Amino acid sequence: MPQPRPYKVALNGYGRIGRCVVRALCERGAKAGFEVVAINDLADMASLEYLTRFDSTHGRFPGEVRVEGQYLHINDHRIKVSRSPTPEGVDWAGLEVDLVLECSGVYNTREDGQRFLDAGAPRVLFSQPMASERDVDATVVFGINQHRLTGRELLVSAASCTTNCSVPLLRLLDQAIGLEYITITTIHSAMNDQPVIDAYHHE
């Protein structure tokens, strides 16, 4: 029986989340059912290669990583790299992707999502929460409400890291004892834009 073709994914943004996606899919191999075929990021090719190869948290990448022209080769996969500062600068349709995974954190409104769709992206999954629930067709925490997806959604958010950590526990508590109101305090790991010395910062 022929195997179904992998779901083709393009990453817009190759920071922490984008690189973790690539690593996770490569570690799972063909059984993941997904293949990253394109990356759009402003960094130069040498930096993309280095940051793929070395990770302070997860260690060295367990495979081959090399650059050839405008392609990042990871094991036996060839990933097309573009450096457009806007969604409109990438030919998503020409890349024949099934999904754009928006990992830059820059875009969080329905208007932003429409820019990807107008540029040829068939669907967009945002790795961050949106500005409001009106800005997305669905917000999904996997293991909690993914069954509500109909397949007609074009703009979906994977919520925030805090939401993904807290909601499964809150669901268990709600089922066991019932919850009316909750307050959550998050101790968050350092972000890539936070200085380690005293400096101005929006948060």
Briefly describe each language-model feature range.
Residues 2-196, 200-203:
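N-terminal Rossmann-like NAD(P) cofactor-binding subdomain of oxidoreductases
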